[in-house]
């Protein structure tokens, strides 16, 4: 591909992206057609990371054989009673404090009645009247690399955080016309986090979920493995025009990934706008996200409000939590002690990266959003006896390593290249031994070899070393000037961009190994 074609192609791509994402790039929510506004509230069910269930001693293990982790209480055998798991309460309090909630000194458990085959008791034990905590605020950055030009911050109020038990799983066999029930999940401890409808776009919702995942994993209160169902998201969505009452909302249930949160919400917003613009009516219904078809599909309507017949759970006493002063921590869960041992949260880490290491907010967001990437950054930067540039390390990890991993469709968690080898590539870049193009070749070769050989050996063996010899580069510059007289003429007439066309020819001849900065300087001197 010639440099002209490449330039025109990149310009076309830029203009298309600019039209599609102009409002997001400006750091603001997208503007809807005909002044439609969307209102989004999330409910997040996070599985509490404990070894046993909320009210029984049965093991919690995702990959266990069917119905192998079921106690008598989980199966609702008459005469069995619930015993509250203290660890679940402690992790719930820990999460509430990290999110700025007010932990209630006394909370209550309730029965929520409904019938499903995988709910053998006919009710779920939850917290309706007096939850573990209320209030709270989650602030988070909204930024999509490659789409957003600039991040912006959004906040969502947390209405309440409550403890509850999960239901079992129904497995439907259409061939045999049977429904099979697995009770391994029945009684697994959950935190339900109910957010106020403060969001406007799918990207904001996805950013909230991403930030919540970062917080919960740092707290150790949830594994957040969405592929295992450890974190599930329900979205309540409505649209209305400015200065009009809120529209009828629909609920999209059990969204199973961060990207799916954005996609499902954006689809549902556009679906509702399309119906209303066509003179139709939105029904209060529950919908599901069909990832394969990339659409929401109707599950059941909610026009008739279901009566869950909430009532106090008679077999559990009020839950007392110490929220001020001293107490016997062996008897009562102590929120004061738990609050004093909270870890550094993602926003504090981002602040330090910007203020201490002088990186951009965009870089800080990308690094902190992936714990493996951030660990590589810290390991390389903190190596004893080395004084590396934080900006150089971050640039390599974000612009070179992630580019190659994305090209190979490999998650960074699966990357077998050790931090020591990544540090070596960074040093070679900083020492002008290789350039960015050669760094990518080395990373690709290291990936193919599962990181067994050092980058220095790979560079030597494949002759992937930058050409820095002045005489060699001068000879290449002379050839480029000689072979491209029309480009030279345009440059001398004032078209300065033509200089980079000549530099591109030199890069091509050298197989991208030449020191580009040096070649540009030499060309300038030769063409004076």
Swiss-Prot record:
Protein EC: 6.3.5.-
Q: Which reaction does it catalyse?
A: L-glutamyl-tRNA(Gln) + L-glutamine + ATP + H2O = L-glutaminyl-tRNA(Gln) + L-glutamate + ADP + phosphate + H(+)
Q: Is Phosphoprotein tagged as a keyword?
A: no
Domain of life of the native organism: Eukaryota
| Listed GO CC annotations | glutamyl-tRNA(Gln) amidotransferase complex; mitochondrion
Transit peptide location on this chain? 1-21
Q: Carries keyword Magnesium?
A: no
Localisation per UniProt entry = Mitochondrion
SMART domains attached to this UniProt entry: GatB_Yqey
Keyword annotations for this protein, in alphabetical order, are: ATP-binding, Ligase, Mitochondrion, Nucleotide-binding, Protein biosynthesis, Transit peptide
Recorded hits in PANTHER family, A to Z, give:
GLUTAMYL-TRNA GLN AMIDOTRANSFERASE SUBUNIT B MITOCHONDRIAL AND PROKARYOTIC PET112-RELATED, GLUTAMYL-TRNA(GLN) AMIDOTRANSFERASE SUBUNIT B, MITOCHONDRIAL
Q: Could you tell me what this protein does?
A: Allows the formation of correctly charged Gln-tRNA(Gln) through the transamidation of misacylated Glu-tRNA(Gln) in the mitochondria. The reaction takes place in the presence of glutamine and ATP through an activated gamma-phospho-Glu-tRNA(Gln).
Q: Which family does it belong to?
A: Belongs to the GatB/GatE family. GatB subfamily.
Q: Relate the assembly described in the record.
A: Subunit of the heterotrimeric GatCAB amidotransferase (AdT) complex, composed of A, B and C subunits.
Task: Report what the protein is called.
Answer: Glutamyl-tRNA(Gln) amidotransferase subunit B, mitochondrial
Species the sequence originates in: Aedes aegypti
């Amino acid at each position: 591909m010639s440099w002209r074609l490449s330039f025109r192609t990149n310009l076309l791509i830029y203009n298309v992206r600019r039209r599609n994402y102009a409002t997001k790039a400006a750091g603001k929510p997208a503007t809807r057609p005909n002044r439609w506004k969307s209102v989004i509230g999330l409910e997040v069910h996070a599985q509490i990371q404990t070894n046993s269930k909320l009210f029984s001693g049965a093991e919690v293990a995702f990959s266990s054989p069917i119905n192998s982790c079921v106690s008598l209480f989980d199966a609702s055998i008459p005469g069995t009673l619930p015993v509250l798991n203290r660890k679940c309460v402690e992790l719930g309090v820990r999460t509430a404090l990290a999110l700025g909630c007010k932990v209630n000194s006394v909370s209550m458990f309730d029965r929520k009645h409904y019938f499903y085959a995988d709910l053998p008791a006919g009710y779920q034990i939850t917290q309706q009247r007096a939850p573990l905590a209320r209030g709270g605020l989650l602030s988070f950055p909204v930024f999509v690399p490659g789409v957003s030009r600039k991040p912006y911050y959004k906040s969502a109020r947390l209405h309440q955080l409550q403890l509850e038990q999960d239901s079992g799983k129904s497995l439907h066999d259409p061939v045999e016309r049977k429904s099979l029930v697995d009770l391994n999940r029945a009684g697994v401890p959950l935190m339900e986090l109910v957010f106020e409808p403060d969001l406007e776009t799918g990207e904001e919702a996805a950013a909230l979920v991403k930030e919540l995942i970062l917080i919960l994993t740092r707290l150790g209160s949830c594994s957040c493995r969405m592929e295992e169902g450890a974190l599930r998201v329900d979205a309540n969505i409505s649209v209305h025009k400015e200065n009009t009452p809120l529209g009828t909302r629909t609920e999209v249930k059990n969204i199973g990934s961060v990207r799916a949160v954005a996609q499902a919400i954006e689809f549902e917003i556009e679906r509702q706008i399309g119906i209303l613009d066509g003179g139709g009516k939105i029904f209060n219904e529950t919908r599901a996200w069909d990832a394969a078809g990339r659409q929401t599909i109707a599950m059941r309507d909610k026009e008739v409000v279901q009566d869950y017949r909430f009532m106090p759970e008679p077999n559990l006493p009020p839950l007392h939590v110490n929220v001020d002063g001293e107490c016997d921590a062996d008897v009562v869960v102590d929120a004061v002690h738990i609050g004093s041992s909270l870890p550094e949260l993602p926003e504090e880490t981002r602040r330090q990266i910007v203020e201490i290491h002088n990186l951009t907010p965009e870089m800080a967001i990308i690094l902190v959003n992936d714990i493996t990437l951030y660990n590589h950054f810290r390991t390389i930067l903190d190596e004893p006896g080395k004084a590396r540039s934080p900006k150089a390390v971050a640039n390599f990890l974000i612009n070179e390593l992630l580019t190659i991993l994305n090209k190979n469709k490999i998650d960074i968690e699966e990357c077998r290249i050790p931090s020591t080898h990544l540090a070596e590539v960074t040093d070679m870049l900083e020492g002008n031994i290789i350039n960015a193009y050669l760094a990518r070749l080395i990373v690709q070769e290291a990936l193919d070899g599962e990181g067994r050989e050092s980058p220095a050996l790979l560079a030597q063996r494949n002759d992937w070393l930058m050409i820095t010899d002045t005489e060699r580069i001068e000879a290449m510059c002379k050839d480029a000037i000689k072979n491209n007289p029309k480009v030279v003429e345009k440059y001398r007439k004032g078209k300065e961009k033509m200089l980079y066309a000549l530099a591109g020819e030199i890069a091509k001849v050298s197989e991208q190994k030449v020191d580009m900065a040096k070649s540009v300087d030499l060309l300038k001197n030769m063409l004076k």
